[in-house]
């Protein structure tokens, strides 16, 4: 065919009747605007434009949008689509002519290029903010509009109309060019860049003036929005450097929690006003959410409708293409000047291109719908969290204290209910999109197959409710699993906390068995869960097969015609479309029900009682300054700062005379006060008190008399039934601690009775938002005796404490809370029983240095609630409480004069406290606390050191490697871990899973191939009605086999996952429980517990479905590629570049997704912790009036979590858009190849069907790969513990060789003993030699770290004995099996450990002893009467950790436990360190009598306790330096023992 612009006919070039009368020259005229634009713009684009000064200097170049920006992009895309149609129409028309007529499509091609150039040119001009250069575009649109109008008029003159496609295309282009011209005119009008002296200046949006904003979706152009092109930089950079919070920056203002909170709050307040007019109505949160977030949901729904409608283009185009391929080739070419729309759409190539464009648009709209709903859901969640937090800060204290609103309920609202509503919003568009999709699908099926299609639709509709039933059962099974999992974790936690005792008593197997029993119950529930999960997967796969089988079999026998390929494969595609919404229906309904329940809970919470607006909060109702100047009877005296630690009322007069004169003002006054906790009954009644300004007021009384309630009532935490609380104005001119300091008018510092700490550093807990002043900070820490404790912490006062940090003792926590109150720059300080958790030394120091010196010298008003009556001598004012009322108020002298009985009662109580003081002086609690903290720090430092060394090694390796190596490591899938997980499920199940999966997908491919053969056979060879029994039978058998294999594969995967989970947990538990004690010393408890909780949960419930989905989607994609290649081998040529593109997409996405997932997870915990710690410390926060600061912190944490989740969602959209576009390219390639190279219509239909399938599953392959990579991290963590070396439980002696009653005598010989904790550590005992006679009482002492406890551990082989030996009753303990050795000895540890269960279980977990023996042990331990008084006696309940017993009782239970064993050797490892003297005396007495004939080795906490021992061993730095009786050692005045005795006096 010859090539020419107007064809070979000479008349085509005739312009005799005028140029415009020649169609070819009119088409040539249309080239002029395009050539003009290309000629003008290309030099500007490639050479550069404008001066640099005209460009906006900002880090984001996408912010500037000229007027009509989005409209321009939409119109340009529409114009490009019309140009494609024009090109296609021209090519199809040209193909019907004898010679080539370039004018039919060449102008359209140039138009397409010019339009593309126009939008590129516009984008560059826009980002450079140089609008003057847009004049070229204005001229282009004017010229294009004119030329297209001339062409349209010419067609109209020829008599063409709406039935002619070319006329329609030209008309649409005239409209589009005209609209684009109008857009340019509007830009000129608004920006005033042409013919105006002062062009408009444009400022960047407020968001992008902040360099921290990195989320650019709202600011980029439409193309970048649709394709998430702006995400490329972040996702690609993840290979070089992990994505951190700095990389993702901050949220734009419109997406921040505070912005959405204001929006939702206004809508909710409007609903509250409407509800106020109707008493029985509550404000509707649903309507509030609709008002606030309805618009984006409607936009998302519109996108969804468009996507769903475009989704039906696939089946229709498949039908059209297969029909065209099936038609016999007609060699006679019918010439026509123009094509109709019907003729145009009958062209197979046109249909292929339209299918490609429809897929692109469908997937773009679908991802846009997903993004808008996710963004709206995130915004809703942020707003709800802010609303909940705002309510928490105003929540009535009685709601929390009286149990109406628990901390768990608040945490559920935050962690569960808000997420339920967010997920419901994600699924919302499905509610109204699904009915349209189902109706459209059924109508199209009916048009294709007639009434037989209704049979298949009926099968789907009837079977779909089963999915809802399965989903309900899944939820029940999950709840049951959670309950068992909680119980298992509780037991595991107990094991880990008491692991030292379990090992020493050789009880590991008993407790391990208990955990295994609970695990079996959990696994039973997991089996149910796995079964229903398998059924759900089975239903998803089997229902489409069943529907297709029913439809085609019905059609084969009920219809009068054979099944054609076009009908068959279009129907298959429609069935896949129809099944999806019906399956989603159950999920949407389930989430809708959950959302309704969540809204009910949220509404109840938001309508719950709030705290009253008291005068001290609002600044109103204050007591006039003048009326406060009433004499309070207080006489001023100086303080004796060097007063001893005992206080007597007899010294009162002397103490009072020493206090300087102070102001007589009243700081707080309560008149006729009646206060309640919300029940309506007054907890405090008839309260008339006054608190003098600048003085120390003490509130005293019996436990439960209302002292703490009085403080809280003054703070406004209680409900005021009657009366008033007045707060005095503050005299700002008073001298203060700092000359430059100014105090808040109603500022209060408050230390609660129950210490409350933030999850923050020690410094942040003390300063509590106030500016840091080093001098003041040091004074406070010294006053609270905190510096020695801070010095023990690994990072000093920068160490994080609280839930996520170091666990401090009660006393240490209490002192930090008191330090916080002291540090604050407030006029008034409330201290609620600050001495309760402190020993006498600390209490005395805090009273002297903290309260009397630091606070009183600063003339601050101090209100102190205390039981320590010995401090009453320092009180300026005393309030005595009894049964919720004020018993007495006044100075101590007033009370002594007016109420002698009360005064004498106080003196009696003080004498008792003095007696207890003598005992407490010996039982130094602070020393014990610091020792415990030191041990914890040692363990953490050791672990941290190991981790630091590992990190340093990794860093060195990373530095040595080049960038490509780092990228390779970041992108590498953990295949080794995957294989290890798969083999944990058993090789048989692994083989069965692989085999069944391959067989199932082979059968599914066979079903489709059989259908292709069936339809092709009868459509070609026998167009009439034929006997189809053979094909129907074969099709039915294959479908039945496919359904059966769907069930087998789903069950196999779940069962393999369950088996792997069972084996991994079993191995982990046994490895941990048999691990060396050193492992538990150096590994934080939370880290080990995390393996049994979060990691085990991932292995149990998350990996199996991910693995199933990954294998299914991968095999579907591979089978699709295989079938397409089989149908059209030419496709393989295009497969290579598509495969390369897919490889790089998944490679970059997996790394970025993993980082963003970790960021999302890591930012959730601080947010949840902030909510829980706010609820716990509500009274303190409100007392300090720090609500605003805490709100701001909550908003920051919410935004941080939201930005991480938003980026993760955007990354998922980035992936799905690209894989969807790749899928569309595969469809286009397959279509073109099928049309050009295949004459078998069945295979063409099959190839196109599988090509459409790929678009659905490509992104799932990558998503599942990314998820599996993250989840395999849990397996890797578990595996890291499984490689740990266990203790060597075997010995050279067989257990049967050990005498039954060994050790019977209790003789111990220590020969040159050397001990260390690990091979790479220094010895802790060096060449120790000692001999202990049978039945001898031995005392071991030494300074901290001298090796005392190490020796006790050596008896049980808990440490590495690398030299020397210990011989007990003639047997070297190194030869004994560990279980035998440990089961024959007894030990009582410093920390008394009891386990949850019964008293019987704690004494005899092996159930070997009779009740008489147990009662005998309890009687010896002085516990028999107490246990008898308990309900159940020996079977009485022991709570976790034995918390329902005192520390002393717990230690006595441990003694009884040791006696039950009746070992001839008892070791007491500082067993009396944590108990008082009275309990210690009982313990020593019992040991001397009950163990009179046994060997007792006592490691002394107090040297005085071993003075009467038959032998005393004194250690120093791991060496035995002294060995003799106590009296003999005391004779050596310079000896270590003598020094220790003198020190402890």
Swiss-Prot record:
Q: Where in the cell is it found?
A: Membrane
Topological category with respect to the lipid bilayer: Multi-pass membrane protein
Per its UniProt record, what InterPro entries does this chain match? AAA+_ATPase, ABC1_TM_dom, ABC1_TM_sf, ABC_transporter-like_ATP-bd, ABC_transporter-like_CS, ABC_transporter_C-like, ABCC8/9, ABCC9
Q: Where is the ABC transmembrane type-1 domain?
A: 297-594, 990-1270
> Which keywords does UniProt give here?
ATP-binding, Glycoprotein, Membrane, Nucleotide-binding, Receptor, Repeat, Transmembrane, Transmembrane helix, Transport
Q: Where are the transmembrane segments?
A: 31-51, 73-93, 102-122, 133-153, 168-188, 302-322, 348-368, 421-441, 453-473, 529-549, 569-589, 987-1007, 1031-1051, 1124-1144, 1242-1262
User: Where is ATP 1 bound in this sequence?
Assistant: 701-708
The principal location of this protein is: membrane
Database matches in Gene3D superfamilies: ABC transporter type 1, transmembrane domain, P-loop containing nucleotide triphosphate hydrolases
Question: Which cellular components does GO assign to this protein?
Answer: acrosomal vesicle; cytoplasm; inward rectifying potassium channel; membrane; mitochondrion; plasma membrane; protein-containing complex; sarcolemma
Q: Which residues lie on this side of the membrane: Cytoplasmic?
A: 52-72, 123-132, 189-301, 369-420, 474-528, 590-986, 1052-1123, 1263-1545
Annotated ranges, domain ABC transporter: 668-908, 1308-1542
Q: Could you say which tissues express the protein in this record?
A: Expressed at high levels in heart, skeletal muscle and ovary. Moderate levels are found in brain, tongue and pancreatic islets. Low levels are found in lung, testis and adrenal gland. Expressed at very low levels in stomach, colon, thyroid and pituitary.
Cite the record's note on assembly. Answer: Interacts with KCNJ11. Interacts with KCNJ8.
Q: Which family does it belong to?
A: Belongs to the ABC transporter superfamily. ABCC family. Conjugate transporter (TC 3.A.1.208) subfamily.
List the protein's name.
ATP-binding cassette sub-family C member 9
The gene is Abcc9
């Amino acid at each position: 065919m010859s090539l020419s612009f107007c064809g070979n006919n000479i008349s085509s070039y005739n312009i005799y009747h005028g140029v415009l009368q020649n169609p070819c020259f009119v088409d040539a005229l249309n080239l002029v605007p395009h050539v003009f634009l290309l000629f003008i713009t290309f030099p500007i684009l490639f050479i550069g434009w404008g001066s640099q000064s005209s460009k906006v200097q900002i880090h984001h170049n996408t912010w500037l949008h000229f007027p009509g920006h989005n409209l321009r992009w939409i119109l340009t895309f529409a114009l490009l689509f019309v140009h494609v149609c024009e090109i296609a129409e021209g090519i199809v028309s040209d193909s019907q002519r004898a010679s080539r007529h370039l004018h039919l499509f060449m102008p359209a091609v140039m138009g397409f290029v010019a339009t593309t150039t126009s939008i590129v040119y516009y984008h560059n001009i826009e980002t450079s903010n140089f609008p003057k250069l847009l004049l070229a575009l204005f001229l282009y649109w004017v010229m294009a509009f004119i030329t297209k109008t001339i062409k349209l008029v010419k067609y109209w003159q020829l008599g063409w109309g709406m039935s002619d496609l070319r006329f329609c295309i030209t008309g649409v282009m005239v409209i589009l060019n005209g609209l684009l011209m109008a857009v340019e005119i509007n830009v000129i009008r608004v920006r005033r860049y042409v013919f105006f002296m002062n062009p408009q200046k444009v400022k960047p949006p407020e968001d992008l003036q902040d360099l921290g904003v990195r989320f650019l979706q709202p600011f980029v152009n439409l193309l970048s929005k649709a394709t998430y092109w702006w995400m490329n930089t972040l996702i690609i950079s993840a290979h070089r450097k992990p994505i951190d919070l700095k990389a993702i920056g901050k949220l734009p203002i419109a997406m921040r929690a505070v912005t959405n909170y204001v929006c939702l709050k206004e809508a909710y307040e409007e609903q509250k006003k409407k509800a106020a007019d109707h008493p029985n109505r509550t404000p509707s949160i649903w309507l509030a959410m609709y008002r606030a977030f309805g618009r984006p949901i409607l936009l998302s729904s519109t996108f969804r409708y468009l996507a769903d409608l475009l989704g039906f283009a696939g089946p229709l185009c498949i039908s059209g293409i297969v029909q065209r391929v099936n038609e016999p080739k007609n060699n006679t070419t019918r010439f026509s000047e123009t094509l109709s729309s019907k003729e145009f759409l009958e062209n197979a190539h046109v249909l292929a291109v339209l299918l490609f464009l429809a897929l692109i648009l469908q997937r773009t709209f679908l991802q846009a719908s997903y993004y808008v709903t996710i963004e709206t859901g995130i915004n809703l969640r942020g707003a709800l969290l802010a609303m909940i937090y705002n309510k928490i800060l105003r929540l009535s204290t009685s709601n929390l204290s009286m149990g109406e609103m628990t901390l768990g309920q608040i945490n559920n609202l935050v962690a569960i209910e808000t997420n339920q509503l967010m997920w419901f919003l994600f699924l919302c568009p499905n509610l109204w999109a699904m009915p349209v999709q189902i109706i459209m699908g059924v109508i199209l099926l009916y048009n294709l197959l007639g009434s037989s299609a209704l049979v298949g639709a009926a099968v789907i509709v009837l079977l779909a409710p089963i999915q809802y039933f399965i989903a309900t059962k899944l939820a029940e099974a999950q709840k049951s699993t959670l309950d068992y999992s909680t119980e298992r974790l509780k037991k595991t936690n107990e094991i880990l906390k008491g692991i030292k005792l379990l090992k020493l008593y050789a009880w590991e197997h008993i407790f391990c068995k208990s955990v295994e029993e609970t695990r079996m119950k959990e696994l039973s529930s997991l089996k149910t869960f796995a079964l229903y999960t398998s059924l759900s997967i089975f239903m998803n796969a089997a229902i489409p097969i069943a529907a297709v089988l029913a439809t085609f079999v019905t059609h084969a026998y009920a219809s009068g015609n054979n099944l054609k390929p076009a009908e068959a494969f279009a129907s298959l595609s429609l069935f896949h479309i129809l099944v999806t919404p019906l399956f989603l229906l159950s999920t949407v309904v389930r989430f809708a029900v959950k959302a309704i329940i969540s809204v009910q809970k949220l509404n109840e919470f938001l309508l719950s009682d709030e705290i009253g607006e008291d005068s001290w909060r609002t600044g109103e109702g204050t007591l006039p300054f003048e009326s406060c100047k009433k004499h309070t009877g207080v006489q001023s005296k100086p303080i004796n700062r060097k007063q001893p630690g005992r206080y007597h009322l007899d010294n009162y007069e002397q103490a009072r005379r020493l206090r300087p004169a102070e102001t007589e003002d009243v700081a707080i006054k309560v008149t006729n006060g009646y206060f309640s906790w919300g029940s309506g009954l007054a907890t405090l009644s008839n309260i008339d008190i006054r608190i003098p300004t600048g003085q120390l007021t003490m509130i005293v009384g019996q436990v439960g008399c209302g002292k703490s309630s009085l403080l809280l009532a003054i703070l406004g935490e209680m409900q005021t039934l009657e009366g008033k609380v007045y707060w005095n104005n503050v005299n700002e001119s008073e001298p203060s601690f700092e000359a430059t300091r100014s105090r808040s008018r109603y500022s209060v510092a408050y230390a609660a009775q129950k210490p409350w700490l933030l999850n923050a550093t020690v410094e942040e807990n003390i300063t509590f938002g106030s500016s840091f002043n080093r001098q003041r900070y040091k004074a406070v820490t010294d006053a609270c005796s905190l510096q020695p404790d801070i010095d023990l912490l690994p990072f000093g006062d920068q160490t994080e404490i609280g839930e996520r940090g170091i666990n401090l003792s009660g006393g240490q926590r209490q002192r930090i809370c008191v330090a916080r109150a002291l540090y604050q720059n407030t006029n008034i300080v409330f201290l609620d029983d600050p001495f309760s958790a402190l020993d006498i030394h600390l209490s005395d120091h805090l009273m002297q240095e903290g309260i009397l010196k630091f606070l009183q010298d600063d003339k601050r008003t101090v209100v102190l609630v205390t039981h320590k009556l010995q401090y009453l001598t320092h009180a300026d004012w005393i309030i005595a409480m009894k049964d919720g009322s004020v018993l007495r108020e006044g100075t101590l002298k007033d009370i002594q004069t007016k109420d002698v009985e009360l005064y004498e009662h106080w003196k009696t109580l003080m004498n008792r406290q003095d007696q207890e003081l003598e005992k407490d002086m010996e039982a130094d609690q602070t020393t014990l606390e610091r020792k415990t903290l030191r041990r914890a720090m040692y363990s953490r430092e050791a672990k941290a050191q190991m981790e630091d060394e590992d990190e340093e090694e990794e860093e060195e390796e990373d530095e040595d490697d080049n960038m490509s190596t780092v990228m390779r490591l970041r992108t590498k899938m953990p295949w080794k871990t995957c294989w290890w997980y798969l083999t944990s499920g058993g090789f048989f199940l692994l083989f069965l899973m692989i085999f069944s999966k391959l067989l199932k997908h082979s059968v599914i491919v066979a079903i489709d191939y059989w259908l292709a053969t069936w339809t092709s056979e009868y459509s070609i060879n026998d167009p009439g009605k034929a006997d189809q029994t053979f094909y129907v039978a074969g099709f039915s058998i294959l479908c039945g086999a496919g359904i059966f294999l769907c069930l087998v594969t789903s069950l196999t995967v779940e069962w393999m996952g369950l088996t792997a989970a069972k084996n991994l947990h079993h191995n982990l538990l046994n490895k941990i429980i048999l691990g060396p004690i050193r492992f538990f010393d150096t590994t934080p408890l939370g880290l080990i517990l995390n393996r049994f909780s979060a990691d085990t949960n991932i292995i149990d419930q998350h990996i199996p479905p991910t693995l199933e989905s990954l294998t299914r989607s991968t095999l579907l994609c591979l089978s699709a590629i295989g079938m397409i290649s089989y149908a059209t081998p030419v496709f393989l040529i295009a497969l290579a570049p598509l495969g390369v593109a897919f490889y790089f997409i998944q490679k970059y996405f997996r790394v970025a997704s993993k980082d963003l997932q970790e960021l999302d997870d890591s930012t959730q915990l601080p947010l949840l912790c902030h909510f829980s710690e706010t609820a716990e410390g509500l009274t303190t926060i409100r007392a300090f009036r720090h609500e605003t600061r805490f709100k701001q912190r909550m908003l920051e944490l919410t935004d941080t979590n939201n930005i991480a989740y938003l980026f993760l969602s955007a990354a998922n959209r980035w992936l799905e858009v690209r894989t969807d576009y790749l899928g569309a390219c595969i469809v286009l390639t397959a279509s073109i190849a099928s049309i050009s190279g295949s004459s078998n219509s069945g295979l063409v239909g099959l190839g196109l069907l599988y090509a459409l399938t790929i678009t659905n599953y490509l992104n799932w392959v990558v998503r599942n790969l990314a998820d599996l990579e993250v989840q395999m991290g849990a397996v890797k963590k578990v595996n890291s513990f499984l490689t740990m070396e266990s203790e060597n439980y075997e010995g050279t002696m067989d257990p049967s060789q050990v005498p039954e009653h060994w050790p019977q005598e209790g003789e111990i010989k220590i020969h040159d003993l050397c001990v260390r904790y690990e091979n790479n550590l220094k010895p802790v005992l060096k060449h120790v030699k000692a001999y202990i006679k049978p039945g001898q009482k031995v005392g071991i002492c030494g300074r901290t770290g001298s090796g005392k406890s190490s020796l006790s551990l050596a008896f049980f082989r808990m440490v590495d004995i690398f030299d020397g030996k210990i011989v007990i009753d003639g047997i070297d303990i190194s030869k004994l099996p560990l279980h035998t050795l440990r089961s024959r000895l007894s030990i009582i540890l410093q920390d008394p450990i009891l386990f949850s269960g019964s008293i019987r279980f704690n004494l005899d977990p092996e159930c070997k002893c009779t009740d008489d023996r147990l009662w005998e042990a309890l009687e010896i331990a002085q516990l028999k009467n107490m246990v008898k008084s308990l309900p159940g006696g020996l079977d009485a309940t022991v709570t976790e950790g034995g918390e329902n017993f005192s520390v002393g009782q717990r230690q006595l239970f441990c003694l009884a436990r040791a006696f039950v064993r009746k070992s001839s050797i008892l070791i007491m490892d500082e067993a009396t360190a944590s108990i008082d003297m009275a309990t210690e005396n009982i313990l020593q007495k019992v040991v001397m009598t009950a163990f009179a004939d046994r060997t007792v080795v006592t490691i002394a906490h107090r040297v005085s306790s071993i003075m009467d021992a038959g032998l005393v061993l004194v250690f120093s730095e791991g060496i035995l330096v002294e060995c003799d009786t106590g009296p003999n050692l005391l004779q050596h005045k310079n000896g270590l023992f003598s020094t220790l005795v003198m020190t402890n006096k």
